[in-house]
Amino acid sequence: TFPVGAKLDLAAGREYMFDRVYRQQPERFYTTDMHGVDWDKMTAAYRRFLPHIDNNYDFAELLSEWLGELNVSHTGGRFYPKGQSEPTASLGLFFDWNYTGKGMLIAEVVEKGPFDTANTRVKAGTVIEKIDGVEITPDADYYTLLNNKARKKTLVSLFDPQTKEHWEEVIIPITNGAFSDLLYSRWVKQRAADVDRWSGGRLGYVHIESMGDDSFRSVYSDILGKYNNREGIVIDTRFNGGGRLHEDIEILFSGQKYFTQVVRGRETCDMPSRRWNKPSIMVMCEANYSNAHGTPWV
């Protein structure tokens, strides 16, 4: 092996990418008139900003503004920087931000988080006093104490204001990405509880997280499993980023009962047995994107 050095002309690289977008759009745009936009004129209007851009954050914004003139979805520019130099871990907790004393007052322990275990004494109302021996003062930002702590054993010093007891526990913080997944599950569980309460147990609830296989399998399992005997189902598609699932969803929720199987005088199942045969309603919002935007219209 031997060392090799290279000098990159970043400005020339951005100009190349700009020109590539300019050439490709007329060839690939879904209508030949490009929504009536004079592409050459529009390109010239945005090209004049190019010499003044010295970073990829701004370059991505330029591409997005330029392509946005076409007034069509699924276009734009994105810049993905390298990962954080010091990613901050999560304890899987919500805190009471009105609390003004020392430490952090826990408002909620998130289900399946680091403190949601059988051997912890932490609960809502517990105060975290220290993290790895560093005291949390009212004017301190406790997040810095969790830098680079994901998946690493961390000592947490705790206090119960009711019993006046102090103790310590060792936990393993999770990444913020993992915490986001827990918050999503928490949100779905809360929405399902709302529907169950408001309908008096008559309706089920499922959320389609994305238009992909994993989401479909989860929805399929719930509607033909725990919600199989409900009178109807609420299908929530809000905040779904898309994929390609509209045909599968249409088939799954458009079943028409044609037969009821009876065994020894008892109804055992309806046919089709692998499709939803009862009423359903689909919820959407402005944050639905791509295939998730189109699916409610199917």
Where do the protein language model's features map onto the residues?
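Sequence signature of WD/YWTD-type beta-propeller architectures
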Residues: 1-76, 187, 191, 217
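PDZ/PDZ-like groove recognition
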Residues: 22-47, 92-110, 202-205
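Extended, small/polar residue-biased N-terminal targeting/export presequences
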Residues: 49-102, 165-190
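PDZ/PDZ-like domain segments forming the peptide/carboxylate-binding groove
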Residues: 86-138, 213
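Cleft-lining beta-strand/loop regions that shape enzyme active-site pockets
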Residues: 11, 15, 26-30, 34, ...
